[in-house]
């Protein structure tokens, strides 16, 4: 098949796809499918010759919101490829927050030691971790959490048991989880139902010692409500790889809070994922040509 890679040329990904016998072309009008690796505003108008779109990201909610995802073409994302990197980054964020790395960095002084001694918490100390959006990344995170002997709660749409979780609840039956968990990890897709799912009401149900981690999408959290909760001691802290707004302005109060750890949307990095997306694309091409559902095909109605 002929493909166009847009808007960025990833040479390592291109080499993998071309190694499978496919040809990269410059003009989208000459292509059978598009490998898209940009932001939503960069998405091009699709001509009728494009049979499917292979997105390089795990979630295409930004494209759905922009209104470009429709049934004119089939769509596939990169779900599953981010499991190892994002799960490892999540462990790092949890530990950095619980071990008060931000407080130590901002203090710039050894005098912060008494504060850390009195307030540092430990993941292995009978903690409960709730994973909201327990798909492929969540399952890998559950595996990485095992050595810490934590109790784990998975929350998903269906309520079907998630491998490795001690308990699983459907989203509409998980209200009690807000008061039960010590650590909340958000890996949800962004939909109308999940937009600002963490807000003043849900934050108010959490333990004062709770830690909130977001490696999903920034707008899952009402940022103003989070700032208030962190200032007022409603929860203990937050660790954020994604924010709303994003990028987070340099003057935003979250940067100066000693109970907040922030990474700039780097729970996964492009360099790590590029070769993997090439291999996934080859698999999806094979399934597409066989008339089967692609391995990571997206329901264009649901958006994931």
Curated annotation (Swiss-Prot):
This is Uncharacterized protein in proB 3'region. It comes from Corynebacterium melassecola. PANTHER family: 2-HACID_DH_C DOMAIN-CONTAINING PROTEIN (PTHR43333), D-ISOMER SPECIFIC 2-HYDROXYACID DEHYDROGENASE NAD-BINDING DOMAIN-CONTAINING PROTEIN (PTHR43333:SF1). Keywords: NAD, Oxidoreductase. NAD(+) binds at residues 136-137, 215-217, 241, 265-268. Belongs to the D-isomer specific 2-hydroxyacid dehydrogenase family. Pfam families: 2-Hacid_dh_C. Transmembrane segments: none annotated. Its EC number is 1.-.-.-.
């Amino acid at each position: 098949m002929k493909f166009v890679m847009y808007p960025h040329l990833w040479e390592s990904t291109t080499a993998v796809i071309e190694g499978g016998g496919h040809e990269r072309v410059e003009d989208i009008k000459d292509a059978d499918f598009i490998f898209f690796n940009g932001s939503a505003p960069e998405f091009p108008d699709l001509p009728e010759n494009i049979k499917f779109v292979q997105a390089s990201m795990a979630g295409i909610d930004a494209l759905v919101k922009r209104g470009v995802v429709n049934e004119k073409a089939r769509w596939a994302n990169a779900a599953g490829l981010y499991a190892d990197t994002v799960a490892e980054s999540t462990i790092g964020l949890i530990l950095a927050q619980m071990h008060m790395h931000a407080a130590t960095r901002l203090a710039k002084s050894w005098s912060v030691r008494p504060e850390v001694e009195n307030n540092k918490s430990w993941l292995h100390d009978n903690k409960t971790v709730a994973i909201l959006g327990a798909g492929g990344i969540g399952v890998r995170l559950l595996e990485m959490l095992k050595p810490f002997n934590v109790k784990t709660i998975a929350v998903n749409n269906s309520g079907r048991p998630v491998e490795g979780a001690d308990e699983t609840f459907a989203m509409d039956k998980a209200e009690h989880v807000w008061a039960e968990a010590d650590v909340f990890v958000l890996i949800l897709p962004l939909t109308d139902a999940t937009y600002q799912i963490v807000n003043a009401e849900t934050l108010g149900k959490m333990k004062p010692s709770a830690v909130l981690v977001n490696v999903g999408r920034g707008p899952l959290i009402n940022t103003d409500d989070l700032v208030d909760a962190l200032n007022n001691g409603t929860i203990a802290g937050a660790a954020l790889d994604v924010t709303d707004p994003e990028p987070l302005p340099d003057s935003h109060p979250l940067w100066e809070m000693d109970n907040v750890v922030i990474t700039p949307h780097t729970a996964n990095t492009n360099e790590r994922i590029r070769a993997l997306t090439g291999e996934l694309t080859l698999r999806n091409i094979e399934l597409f040509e066989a008339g089967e559902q692609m391995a990571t095909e997206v329901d264009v109605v649901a958006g994931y």
